[in-house]
Regions:
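Helical mechanochemical/support elements of P-loop NTPase systems and associated helical scaffolds
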Residues: 17, 56, 71, 97, ...
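N-terminal targeting/trafficking signals and adjacent low-complexity tails
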Residues: 198-210
Length: 210
């Protein structure tokens, strides 16, 4: 059995640029942070893709950090100008990160680097090098290494429901999926690591494990 706590991913960084968290003042990799920008209406917007124009403000990708920054008016203090923040900022970020993960999985599927369904996953594992094996968070099946041919460095991910996985494949539900080793695996694991910072501690659907 795997542990029920979130196991932080120890993977190589693709982005070596670092930024300072405006709350903790820690210097962190951008891949561990959430970027924010201020719109023309002085409303703070989370920029999870890091592409929006404007000055970037950064916070660690942790729910408690984001909530504390909003409650303490950190954005206003740093900008020295009154700005507004969504009352549900942390939940908004979780939704955006989850959507980003869905988009990455959709790209992997269209590129032929992701398959879903127990039988197809088995065939995939026998012929390709798996980077991520996804088991639906609401699955009643054992979360153990049932299949053979699983690479020792493959990661098991349990943070997406069968309905979420089903949407990737235009089906009602999918319990098992696998993504080949490579850039899709690297990028998705980085996003899942950020996403895991916004799960509730008591929520057992969220973890990455080997």
């Amino acid at each position: 059995m795997f542990g029920r706590e979130v196991v932080l991913l120890k993977s190589a960084r693709s982005d070596k640029n670092m930024r300072k968290c405006i709350l903790t003042k820690e210097l962190c990799y951008k891949s561990d942070l959430i970027r924010f920008v201020v719109g023309p209406n002085k409303f703070v917007v989370p920029d999870v893709a890091g592409r929006l124009p404007g000055r970037g403000l950064w916070l660690k990708a942790k729910k408690d950090i984001v909530t504390a920054a909003c409650d303490k008016g950190i954005f206003t203090n740093v900008l020295k100008d009154k700005v507004s923040v969504p009352i549900d900022m942390a939940d908004l970020i979780e939704g955006l990160l989850r959507k980003r993960c869905h988009e990455l999985m959709g790209m992997a599927r269209r590129a032929g680097q992701m398959v879903g369904g127990y039988a197809k996953v088995g065939l995939f594992l026998s012929s390709k090098d798996a980077g991520i094996i996804i088991v639906a968070s609401d699955s009643r099946r054992s979360r153990s290494k049932e299949k053979t041919n699983i690479p020792p460095d493959a990661k098991f991910v349990f943070c997406f429901s069968s309905t979420e996985l089903g949407r990737i494949f235009d089906r009602d539900k999918i319990v098992y999926a696998v993504i080949s080793s490579g850039s899709f695996t690297t990028n998705l694991l980085l996003e899942i690591k950020r996403l895991s910072g916004f799960f509730k501690e008591e929520n057992e659907r969220s973890y990455i494990s080997k």
